[in-house]
Amino acid sequence: EFQKDEIFKGTFELIDTASTIKLSFAEVLLQNNKTIDTANVNYGEASYSADGLVSITTPEGTSYYYRGVVNNNYVRFANNTWRIVGINPDNSIKLILEKSATSMNYSVYNNAIDYTGLKYIYNNETINNNISTYLEQWYQSTIINNNFDNYVVANSYCNDSSNFVNSYHTYFNGYTRLITDKHPSIICPTTNADFGGTYKQKVGLLSADEVAIAGGVYGVDNYNYYLYNGETFFTTTPADYYNFVANLFIVTN
């Protein structure tokens, strides 16, 4: 079930290093999977079947995301088993760990809106949230220290902090997209907040929008789609802030 609240899974971008004579990794994935345009997907319904790759066009180019039941997206890399999430516009491959790397809180605190950010500014200093610090340490010990860093490229991770206030209740725009409209987006809104936004880095978390594209729907149980692994994990998408409690979207077990 896809909910808002508070274990996480790490994701990062894998660069294709195949020879130009051969098909690239991205081309092989496209050749072996059917594609469907995002305009033809009903995101108000969870996906319980093999839908293939959803194509989404953005100013950066076309991205592809696996949706629904997927049995051919397993990858072994850096001594870990991963699932392929999709293809980025630069043909790098987005992966997610099959099992969570750890169990921990996203943030030490949740009594301020800023704590929904992967990073936030305090006294003119950028502070890593709990989860960001762990991601950096995990990447160092698992990827860099084992000489896999050259295979990984930085990509954009969206921690959408854009929001509006209604009767003292702050709603993030992810709340509107995923609960009200059921219309996920991989375009990250610009923000002037002192937390969140777009982060260009080599490791991160999926957004709730990406979970929705994969086949999840807020408040609906789905034990069939490939992101379900029996664990609860965070996304980077804040949901709301009310009565001194900040909530993020999570994927429940």
Give, region by region, the residue ranges found by the protein language model.
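C-terminal, structured domain-capping segment
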Residues: E1-L23
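Long, domain-scale functional regions
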Residues: K22-N253
